[in-house]
Amino acid sequence: MSSIKWKSKDAASCIIIPSELDHKYSRGTLGVITGSAQYPGAAVLTTSAATATGLGALRFHSSSGLAHLVLHQSPEVLVQPGPVTAWLAGSGINSKRFSDITTWLRHRWFVLLDRQSVPTLLDAGALHLAGSLEQPTLITPHSGELSKLLAQRGVIASAELIESNPSEWAMKASELLAVTVLLKGSKTVVAQDQYLIELPVATPWLATAGSGDVLAGIIGALMATNYIEILNDSKRLADVAATGAFIHNRAALIASNGAPISASSIISAIPKAIGKILA
């Protein structure tokens, strides 16, 4: 199985630089359904990471007072429904559909994913939708989540087995579910049909709470700005996912400089990471 080793020049090709003719809506709008009463920080981290990555606008679909938290951190976020060019759904949402009223309210928004059929990222509590949407779809599980997702389709593979050969299992999941798969781990891989991308080994400091939410926000923003390219090129979604992971690791390295980091510090380093990639 051949693969592509993702490099800075590859990532640069997926970062859309605005022209003097662009305005906020021409640059792409990301619709975000993340966070819950149990994990309110996911709403803040995903939206903050997306806005730091650069896009025209972001629409946050709220419940349970999450809008207040998001707007306090990112007042530029829109909190009313409207047209979007990509979706990010599931981060910080319980996978058990109706475990509490907040989870029910978050899942209620998922019906919009079908109504606006644009490139969609499914994470955490939205992974169960993998394979059910017609639009280009990316899932971003870690090995444990992928193990559960495969088991629901009758394929038994432990998290440990998946971690022993992430490339093989990401490819199998992509074929089984007919989606693009970004399998998170120290060795992150992206698979789409027979197309496989391997990312550089990530800094171990990325093993911190909320870093996956930051990754989802970065990729979501890139999907929103690349939506035309994704719809016109079957491999573009995989390239965009790999670019998001590449930016994520670069930002973590900048934030860390050999020391511990938090998810929030990764977000602060995103613009500098993108600048270095484009330099």
Regions found by a protein language model. Name each.
Residues P136-G144:
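Non-cysteine beta-strand/loop elements that form the S-adenosyl-L-methionine
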